[in-house]
A protein has these predicted regions:
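Terminal alpha-helical segments
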Residues: 1-123
Length: 123
């Protein structure tokens, strides 16, 4: 799943580079973080149910390793409502290009952190 997370991150970056709509960039950044978190939980044989909620996934990872709380402090979990709600009409949410750029950076930070945790577990 970590490979898929990096793929979604690369997609978000490419979409940013070609000037795609900010909401679709944020969506792929959120998906990247979600897949990385789920990869960590799978590695630890933790059930997470059917959820896309980053706040919940970070909490589940924090039960294994308290350092995951840093992701809450960095507001990584805020990608979830931004990515999900902005995809639907009439929500009143409009994402700016600056928010899309920030989403990519947050995804990079989160995936790098999670990848280090996965590698340390495997070694």
């Amino acid at each position: 799943m970590v490979e898929e997370a990096y793929t979604d991150l690369r997609v978000a970056v490419k979409l940013f580079e070609i000037g795609e709509e900010p909401w679709v960039i944020v969506f792929h950044a959120q998906q990247a973080v979600e897949k990385a978190l789920k990869a960590y939980l799978v590695l630890h044989n933790r059930h997470f149910g059917k959820t896309h909620n980053l706040f919940r996934l970070i909490d589940l990872c924090s039960e294994i390793d308290q350092e995951f709380q840093q992701l809450h402090e960095l507001e990584i979990d805020k990608l979830y409502p931004l990515a999900i709600e902005a995809r639907y009409p009439d929500t009143g949410i409009e994402i700016t290009i600056d928010e899309a750029k920030e989403a990519i950076e947050k995804a990079r930070i989160a995936i790098s952190f999670i990848t280090r945790k996965i590698k340390s577990k495997k070694s």
